[in-house]
């Protein structure tokens, strides 16, 4: 979901005594935020090999200022063929129907600012926004080795095993 609570205590470091923050952040933002809070730099090498930079961004600034913009304006999702793209308050999603060609699936569009429960599909009202988000999802999917899509039947790993030589070079 897009509204998952997170409780953070920063001691007396919050000028307004805490409160609710509504900026979009993602689970990938937790490591950079924790490192930022404790003042530790991310390692750049391990065992002589480069360590990939974390995908997220620290959101410590929003802890001190409720009006700070999100440090994570967009995020793609994919799990077992279900897909989604979040960008600046908009969410495009498609829920996978088993044994249905991926090309026949219909994306939904939701305005998370006005409709955080995603109860109103606005795809017919804003088709250009759907096209924009689907295109952004496809770019992110290609850049992050999401293809080929599968339905959770592990076909992807049969075609590209996770233990192949390309992944062995990175420090884990």
Predicted features and spans:
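Histidine-centered active-site microenvironments of extracellular/periplasmic hydrolases
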Residues: 1-14, 26, 168-169
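Intrinsically disordered, low-complexity polar regions and short flexible loop motifs
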Residues: 115
């Amino acid at each position: 979901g897009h509204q998952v609570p997170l409780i953070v205590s920063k001691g007396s470091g919050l000028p307004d005594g805490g409160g609710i923050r509504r900026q979009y952040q993602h689970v990938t933002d937790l490591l950079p935020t924790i490192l930022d809070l404790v003042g530790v730099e991310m390692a750049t090498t391990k065992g002589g090999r480069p360590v990939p930079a974390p995908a997220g961004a620290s959101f410590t600034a929003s802890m001190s200022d409720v009006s700070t913009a999100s440090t994570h304006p967009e995020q793609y999702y994919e799990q077992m063929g279900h897909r989604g793209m979040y960008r600046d308050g908009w969410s495009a999603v498609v829920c996978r129907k088993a044994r249905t060609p991926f090309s026949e699936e219909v994306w939904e569009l939701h305005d998370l600012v006005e409709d955080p429960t995603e109860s109103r599909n606005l795809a017919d009202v804003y088709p250009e926004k759907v096209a924009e988000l689907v295109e952004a999802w496809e770019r992110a999917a290609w850049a992050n080795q999401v293809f080929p899509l599968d339905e959770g039947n592990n076909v992807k790993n049969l075609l590209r095993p996770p233990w192949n030589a390309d992944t062995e070079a990175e420090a884990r």
